[in-house]
UniProtKB/Swiss-Prot annotation:
Homology family: Belongs to the LipB family.
PROSITE patterns tied to this protein: BPL_LPL_CATALYTIC (PS51733), LIPB (PS01313)
Domain BPL/LPL catalytic: 35-211
Function: Catalyzes the transfer of endogenously produced octanoic acid from octanoyl-acyl-carrier-protein onto the lipoyl domains of lipoate-dependent enzymes. Lipoyl-ACP can also act as a substrate although octanoyl-ACP is likely to be the physiological substrate.
Name this polypeptide is given: Octanoyltransferase
EC number in record: 2.3.1.181
Parts of the chain that traverse the membrane: none
Organism (species): Prochlorococcus marinus subsp. pastoris (strain CCMP1986 / NIES-2087 / MED4)
Cited PANTHER family: LIPOYLTRANSFERASE 2, MITOCHONDRIAL-RELATED, OCTANOYLTRANSFERASE
One function term, GO molecular function aspect: lipoyl(octanoyl) transferase activity
Note: In the reaction, the free carboxyl group of octanoic acid is attached via an amide linkage to the epsilon-amino group of a specific lysine residue of lipoyl domains of lipoate-dependent enzymes.
Catalytic residue list: 173
Sites where the protein binds substrate: 75-82, 142-144, 155-157
Cited InterPro entries: aa-tRNA-synth_II/BPL/LPL, BPL_LPL_catalytic, Octanoyltransferase, Octanoyltransferase_CS
Length: 214
């Protein structure tokens, strides 16, 4: 029988990136080893930091790595930036119980983001040849995942009302000339707590999960 139960954490405070990364790894290891059969979802915000995916071009970091918090992690994709005002969602899911297809999973994440933004009357779409979600030529949401023995890690981020100038220190997602935007550029009254509620609701709709607090 497929377990559709997911532990969910939604901290209100800013969370240190590496602490949450270690937490994801613990849940991933528990699913792989069979110690747990529950998925894990985390929604929140990080302190200002930069993360670098597997095989990233370090030239896309436009500063010395000792000037800011930089984390090299086990996800696909290039360098990106996290900060307050950006909603980050991590999904540690056992795809063996859903669909053992990473392309399907990436399209599912894009769908969750697009449905979320459209709930706030923000028209957006995917872009051929690129991951993430875009408004024209501007990028509003980034995706980066890892997967080990069909158990996923990492997830996606949506710029809600963050300080976009922090992206000037990198080549976002390795795309030269990429311009990042906020939800607040299109909906001035957007609130990150409301965005979090909508993301949770749509994840429930798309995966048919039952959420429990640990």
């Amino acid at each position: 029988m497929i377990n559709r139960t997911s532990i969910i954490k939604q901290p209100d405070k800013i969370s240190f990136f590496y602490d949450v990364y270690k937490l994801q790894k613990e849940y991933q290891d528990s699913l792989i080893s069979g110690k747990s059969n529950m998925n894990f979802i985390w929604l929140g915000e990080h302190q200002l930091c930069y993360t670098v995916g597997r095989g990233s071009n370090m030239d896309n970091l436009l500063f010395s790595a000792d000037e800011q918090d930089v984390f090299k992690i086990d996800r696909g994709g290039e360098v990106t930036c996290h900060m307050p005002g950006q909603l980050v969602t991590y999904l540690v899911l056992d795809l063996s119980n859903l669909n053992k297809d990473l392309n399907w999973y990436l399209r599912k994440i894009e769908k969750i983001i697009i449905k979320t933004l459209r709930s706030f009357n923000i028209n957006c779409s995917t872009k051929d040849g690129f991951t993430g979600v875009w408004i024209g030529e501007r990028k509003i949401a980034s995706i980066g995942i890892g997967c080990k023995r069909w158990v996923t890690i990492h997830g996606f981020s949506i710029n809600v009302n963050c300080k976009l100038e922090n992206f000037n220190k990198i080549v976002p997602c390795g795309i030269k000339g990429c311009q990042m935007v906020n939800m607040s550029d299109y909906n001035k009254n957007v609130d990150i707590k409301e965005v979090k509620k909508i993301v949770k609701k749509i994840i429930h709709e798309e995966f048919n999960f039952n959420f429990v607090s640990e």
